[in-house]
UniProtKB/Swiss-Prot annotation:
GO biological process terms held by the UniProt record: 'de novo' pyrimidine nucleobase biosynthetic process; 'de novo' UMP biosynthetic process
Protein residues bound to substrate: H14, V15, R16, N40, H133, H243, A255
Cofactor(s) it depends on: Zn(2+)
Organism: Helicobacter pylori (strain P12)
Pathway listed: Pyrimidine metabolism; UMP biosynthesis via de novo pathway; (S)-dihydroorotate from bicarbonate: step 3/3
Residues holding Zn(2+) 1: H12, H14, K94, D239
EC number(s) recorded for this UniProt protein: 3.5.2.3
Gene symbol of the encoding locus: pyrC
Family label: Belongs to the metallo-dependent hydrolases superfamily. DHOase family. Class II DHOase subfamily.
Role according to the record: Catalyzes the reversible cyclization of carbamoyl aspartate to dihydroorotate.
UniProt-listed InterPro entries: DHOdimr, Dihydroorotase_CS, Metal_Hydrolase
Protein name: Dihydroorotase
Binding residues annotated for Zn(2+) 2, in chain numbering: K94, H133, H167
Keyword Signal carried by entry: no
Length: 339
């Protein structure tokens, strides 16, 4: 059995920087046609020149791959900088509530403040797409739910602004997407295939720790259902986020799952298991092209076959290792060719 996926798109990707970027980028740039690149680096991409420099770094270490750059929404963002980013072709604005995830200490402190709303009003006029890490302070399993009032305010106040709930993790958010025409979402492999049991049901597994947290069986099943039917308002976004094993085994564990090396085989396995392989093309590419109005992307064909694939336990970066999701396991699908 074989399947060919055309122009795979990852609508939420972390490729880090410097040596780590060089080590992990190929796992995404080779099989994927394009990816929305996250701006929460150690020095966040809060201005246009820095964002364009990072884009150039990615392009220098990849080929036939389109990085779709995003600007980090922060308290110091000005209307002039927003206009400058627009003029340089940056189409994505990434909003992190302050302190909610990795490198979000520079995030937005007042989500419904006058300045935030003014920036969003202008982002709407300029045609930006707002990608939001939709969590608010509160009990860890309710953080996304607690952000619903903010999402509703944004959706109603800016009806022409496309708003993406990044890495949807709570089944209660599905109703918002159905209710508001301008609300969309991305789904990760880990949120549609894993639950809290994978993180802490046995021994604590730091390599399954991410934000937002993987949640209950009900959440996983409801989100998986959206993916399997390729809901038209949902696109795939891996949120692949590599960290060194030495940091993952420390006393202060960073959030992030490195899934890039297994994405296409694991998705094929999951969709075949549920008799939905015919919908994988829409989930992995077609929906994103429509939602984000993407065209002129590098043409790419990823051919996969139903043959065993033993997942490497780790990737290497200098003298450090990066644990790969499901490392050491055997998947039933294998990436055979990229053209």
């Amino acid at each position: 059995m074989e399947i060919t996926l055309f122009d795979p798109i990852d609508a939420h990707l972390h490729v880090r920087e410097n040596a780590l970027l060089k080590a992990v980028l190929r796992y995404s740039s080779e099989p994927f046609s394009a990816a929305v690149i996250m701006p929460n680096l150690s020095k966040p991409l809060t201005d246009t020149p820095t964002t364009l420099e990072y884009e150039e770094e990615i392009l220098n270490h990849s080929s036939n791959f389109k990085p779709l750059m995003s600007l980090y929404f922060n308290d110091d963002l000005t209307l002039e900088e927003l206009q400058r980013a627009h003029e340089k072709g940056i189409r994505f604005l990434k909003l992190y509530p302050k302190g909610m995830t990795t490198n979000a200490q520079n995030g937005t402190s007042d989500l419904l403040g006058e300045k935030t709303l003014e920036i969003l009003e202008n982002a709407q006029k300029l045609g930006f797409i707002l990608c939001i890490h939709a969590e608010q302070a509160g009990f860890c399993l309710d953080k996304e739910f607690l952000c619903h009032s903010v999402l509703e305010t944004f959706a109603l106040s800016f009806p022409k602004l496309k708003i993406i709930i990044e890495h949807l993790s709570d089944w209660r958010s599905i109703a918002l997407i159905e209710k508001h025409a301008n609300l969309y979402a991305t789904l990760t492999l880990h949120h549609i295939s894993m639950t809290l049991d994978d993180l802490l049901g046995g021994s604590l597994n730091p390599h399954c720790f991410c934000k937002p947290l993987i949640k209950t069986k009900k959440d996983q099943e409801r989100l998986l259902s959206l993916a399997l039917k390729a809901h038209p308002k949902i696109s795939f976004g891996s949120d692949s986020a590599p960290h060194f094993i030495s940091k993952k085994h420390s006393t202060s564990i960073p959030a992030g799952i490195f899934s890039a090396p297994i994405l296409l085989p694991a998705l094929c396995e999951l969709f075949e298991k549920h008799n939905a392989l015919e919908n994988l093309q829409a989930f992995i590419s077609d929906n994103a092209k429509k939602i984000y109005a993407l065209d002129n992307l590098p043409a790419k064909k990823a051919r996969l076959s139903k043959k065993p694939f033993i997942v490497p336990t780790h990737a290497l970066c200098l003298n450090e290792k990066i644990a790969i999701l499901r490392g050491g396991e055997t998947l039933s699908w294998n990436l055979q060719e990229i053209a």
